[in-house]
Amino acid sequence: MDVKLPKRKKNALLITLPSSIKWEDYEKELKAVEDESQVMNFKVPFLPKNIHHIKRVYLVYQGNIVGWQKFVGTSDKQFKCTTTDKNWEGKFIQRTGPFHKINKIPYKGFQGFRYYDYED
């Protein structure tokens, strides 16, 4: 008899850093939120749904998943980036805390976000 395991809910989001952004510049933003006194905002065309179980946001950079940060929520707002001084408006996925590097996992980049499943 085959046993069917319950389907796990996707417990993370996956985003892609645009190729136009240099990692050295991005590290400055990662450093700014390391102590959780600020959040990083990632612009998306629409907000994810059913996010109560989302714990992490994984980052794709140059064709690889390279690490994750703690997911703290979503917003629909206007703000000025404290690192780049650029004005932003729209829908955002928010994350904060230290960036946890992982062994690279090949993954093709995309726009927006995707739901992702991880195991500790």
Predicted segments — roles?
Residues 66-75:
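Short beta-strand-centered aromatic/proline hotspots
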Residues 1-53, 61, 80, 86-91, ...:
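Compositionally biased, charged N-terminal/linker segments
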